[in-house]
Swiss-Prot record:
PANTHER family, sorted: CLAVALDEHYDE DEHYDROGENASE, SHORT-CHAIN DEHYDROGENASES/REDUCTASES FAMILY MEMBER
Function description: Short chain dehydrogenase; part of the gene cluster that mediates the biosynthesis of azaterrilone A and other azaphilones, a class of fungal metabolites characterized by a highly oxygenated pyrano-quinone bicyclic core and exhibiting a broad range of bioactivities. The first step of the pathway begins with the non-reducing polyketide synthase tazA that assembles one acetyl-CoA starter unit, five malonyl-CoA units, and catalyzes a series of Claisen condensations, methylation, PT-mediated cyclization, and finally releases the first hexaketide precursor through the R-domain.
Enzyme class: oxidoreductase
Superkingdom per UniProt: Eukaryota
Protein family per UniProt: Belongs to the short-chain dehydrogenases/reductases (SDR) family.
Listed GO MF terms: oxidoreductase activity, acting on the CH-OH group of donors, NAD or NADP as acceptor
Keywords attached to this entry: NADP, Oxidoreductase
Protein name per UniProt: Short chain dehydrogenase tazN
Induction data: Expression is positively regulated by the azaterrilone A cluster-specific transcription factor tazR.
């Protein structure tokens, strides 16, 4: 079991104990890879000669993958033998000599895997290093940058080279990129600047990769747990007062990754997943975490990533009551509109026209997309589940005129609608309240507001 909440934990991250009611430090029966069937799938894992990568390769083999390639700089003979002994029907195993920081080496690896497998279903960017501890002013620039070279440039080069192989797989099949990140992406621990910067940047690379290739290729990041592997110098290198923190096993992350990619789960795209969370419980909360978009992207999901930065301001989990299965089902099946297209967000009349056009086709509104080029006037323009709840008495007639009176509000407020609904005198207070609720976050991509897509 990970350390309890009341114990000191220098690596306690956002949402560690809040996302699921149970947490784990070792694998558990519900995610046993032998219960899954990945027959016919092909997988490539980087940094697989030891530690987490080795465990992931073994977990995939136990799940029945047909082909598995592992990239590493060191020998993979012992891993090949272990895979053969662990499986009744061992997969085709391809050892690949790989330096993730070398573009030519990565390109050669992609060519080799493509020639042997033809396509790819899962890519795991696992290779990484910790680097030396030290204050920034005392650090060696080459050593400091080498950590980013391995932890960020490496996943970039590998993703760049292997995406074409993922795209060759059937659109209906599983196609995943899993980036092995770290809770360190969210922490600020002096003397670990290079490592934590690299992992924070890897989170952004994850969301961007998913934005560019999802939902066809689903990209998400994991925190594997705090395992005392070789990257830490092994268990003996952990100081006595921190040993209670480094308790997760490599098998936990290996089995967790296999469980997550065993089915197509578009809603995982762009997210950060902590492997200590109870994953069956997590996937059961899909309807709580995601809101399907109806008008333009029927199979897409609204961009509310749980990136773990501050769970208390994360719309994916804040203020949500536990729903019954039937309530969750209805929420998941519900379709919502997205207001898109060019308009002058400084003019209330144009905002009202846009809302009316949207609600003509669907009486519910999920999101009003603002113009990112005018942050002072449009700000974040996220509006989730509107109705007259917040302004029930004063603005009921106005909401009804917009056909929005039957929706539900979670508290999200956009600058202009705060002004419209609350009146100019209440605008500042309304915006401040929205910030307190943690809803004015994550500016929307410019292409979503400036794409030129207009409503019918």
């Amino acid at each position: 079991m990970p350390p309890s909440k009341d114990q000191p934990n220098i690596l306690r991250g956002p949402g560690d104990y809040e996302v699921t009611t149970r947490v784990h430090n070792d694998t558990y029966p519900e995610i046993d890879p032998r219960l899954l069937n990945l027959q016919g799938k092909s997988v490539f894992v980087t940094g697989g000669s030891r530690g987490l990568g080795r465990s992931m390769a073994l977990s995939f083999a136990k799940a029945g993958v047909s082909k598995i390639a592992v990239g590493a700089r060191s020998s993979l003979e012992s891993l090949a033998k272990e895979i053969a002994e662990a499986c009744v029907n061992p997969p085709e195993f391809l050892p690949v000599k790989l330096d993730v920081t070398d573009e030519a080496s990565v390109a050669a690896a992609a060519t080799e895997v493509g020639r042997a497998f033809g396509q790819l279903n899962v890519l795991v960017n696992n290779a990484g290093i910790l680097g030396k501890y030290g204050l920034i002013a005392d650090s060696d620039p080459e050593e400091w940058w080498e950590v980013l070279n391995v932890n960020l440039r490496g996943p970039y080069l590998v993703t760049r080279a292997f995406v074409p192989l993922l795209l060759k797989a059937s659109k209906d099949d599983i196609r995943y990129i899993v980036n092995v990140c770290s809770v360190g992406a969210h922490l600020t621990n002096p003397t670990l600047s290079s490592y934590q910067v690299s992992k924070n940047a890897l989170l952004k690379l994850t969301t961007l990769t998913n934005a560019e290739y999802g939902p066809g290729v689903i990209t998400f990041a994991i925190h594997p747990g705090n395992s005392p592997t070789d990257i830490m110098g092994g268990p003996e290198a952990i100081p006595p007062h921190h040993k209670h923190v480094f308790v997760e096993t490599p098998e936990l992350s290996g089995d967790s990754v296999v469980f997550l990619v065993s089915k197509r789960r578009e809603w995982l795209g762009g997210r950060y997943i902590n492997c200590t969370w109870d994953l069956p419980e997590l996937v059961s909360k899909e309807a709580e975490i995601c809101i399907p978009v109806g008008l333009y992207q029927a199979k897409e999901y609204v961009d509310i990533p749980f990136n773990g930065l501050r769970p208390e301001i994360d719309t994916a989990f804040q203020g949500r009551k536990q729903r019954t299965p039937e309530q969750a089902r209805r929420a998941q099946l519900a379709k919502y509109n997205v207001v898109k297209g060019g308009m002058d967000n400084r003019r209330d009349s144009q905002i009202f026209i846009r809302i009316k056009r949207s609600t003509k086709h669907n009486p519910r509104l999920v999101r009003l997309v603002g113009n990112k080029s005018r942050p002072a006037t449009s700000g974040i323009c996220r509006v989730d589940f509107f109705d007259c709840t917040a302004q029930k008495q004063r603005d009921k007639a106005q909401w009804q005129s917009l056909k929005l009176s039957k929706a539900q509000v979670t508290g999200s407020v956009v600058t202009h609608l705060t002004q419209i609904l609350s009146g100019n005198s209440q605008r500042t207070a309304g915006i401040q309240r929205a910030r307190e609720l943690g809803q004015i976050i994550w500016p929307l991509a410019a292409e979503q507001s400036d794409s030129g897509n207009s409503l019918p």
